[in-house]
From Swiss-Prot:
This is Ceramide-1-phosphate transfer protein. The keyword Cell membrane applies. Keywords: Cell membrane, Cytoplasm, Endosome, Golgi apparatus, Lipid transport, Lipid-binding, Membrane, Nucleus, Transport. It is found in: Cytoplasm, Cytosol; Golgi apparatus, trans-Golgi network membrane; Cell membrane; Endosome membrane. It comes from Danio rerio (Zebrafish).
Length: 211
């Protein structure tokens, strides 16, 4: 049986993912995402359409990391440099590198923004706040921009089945409401920093719209 979700481990993994010079270690980025998958799975099947895709993307990156060219995949920065210099990224249309590290991580990057926005809404929510609304608003600001209409429609329906705010606080395994809010307050700035570093790197290299 998998370990229960731990918000503390999210904090630790994303903190570990940042080097002194603000490069992002893929090993710890993946570890952070594995914790977030545990969070999604602890809420039942509502997020399965996202978590299954995330798991497959994590596996691709793990294969790169453990492969013969793994030394080029230590950080997101080294991966981008290596793949671009060796023409390993399909920049304008799907071609011979449909599962490049850059494309794979971009999908995780977009999903990370959604979770960051949702958890921030949860952190600042009140007793009468609806999780379905918070989650939908976060989705519409992020992932929805990259999904076709049918998926957006299905997602909207799925979010209607989200449990209440109390359940979300319970699955954090971080104590009472005050403790959960405090730990989210520590974790989310780290997630946001990792997101922004990646966003800036991808923007600089024109990688934000990879097919």
């Amino acid at each position: 049986m998998a370990d229960a979700f731990s918000l503390q481990r999210v904090l630790e993994t994303f903190r570990s993912s940042l080097s002194e010079n603000k490069e992002v270690y893929i090993k710890y980025y993946i570890a952070g995402w594995q914790e977030l998958v545990s969070f999604m799975n602890s809420l039942g099947n509502v997020f399965s359409f996202i978590s299954k895709d995330v798991v497959s993307k994590i596996q691709i990156l793990e294969n790169f990391l453990s492969g013969e060219n793994g030394s080029n995949y230590v950080t997101i920065q080294s991966m981008v440099k290596y793949e671009l210099e060796n023409d390993l990224v399909d920049l304008t249309k799907r071609g011979s590198h449909p599962e490049s590290g850059c494309r794979t991580l971009l999908r995780l990057h977009r999903a990370l923004r959604w979770l960051e926005l949702f958890l921030e809404r949860l952190r600042t929510s009140t007793e009468d706040s609806k999780t379905s609304v918070m989650c939908s608003d976060a989705y519409n600001e992020s992932l929805a921009n990259h999904h076709p209409w049918l998926i957006r429609k299905a997602v909207g329906v799925a979010f209607c089945a989200l449990p209440g705010r109390e359940t979300f606080f319970d699955v954090m395994n971080a104590g009472d409401h005050t403790q959960v809010v405090a730990l989210l307050g520590e974790s989310l700035p780290l997630i946001a920093e990792v997101y922004q570093i990646t966003e800036d790197l991808y923007a600089k290299n024109n990688l934000l719209e990879l097919p």
